[in-house]
Amino acid sequence: FRSHEMGMVDDAIAALQAAARSPRQRFDAASMLGRIYLERKDTTRAIEWLERAAEAPAPTPDAGRALLYDLATTLESIGEQARALAVFVELESESGGYRDVAGQIERLSKVQARG
């Protein structure tokens, strides 16, 4: 059963990669790919796809904010504090008061200041 499930996910990945080539489907397909790779603990690929999604127009402001938040927390999880901070700052400038972004910025700024 497990190998069958993995095969289905691999098929979905191939279909989503093809869909991500279409400008109209890029955000949704790339963000789904990012989340699949996060579940697989493949953070390098997850970040690559989340960044591609972030470059595409989000279908809704909430979807765009959620994607940027996921990207920032994933970057931080691999020690990329400066990049995570930059994404959080972008998110805060676009939509102040989203989740705990202000606190994340304050915390990461202190980490950066300590070097």
Describe every region a protein language model picked out:
Residues 32, 69-70, 104:
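"A position-specific structural signal for the A-helix of alpha-solenoid helical repeats
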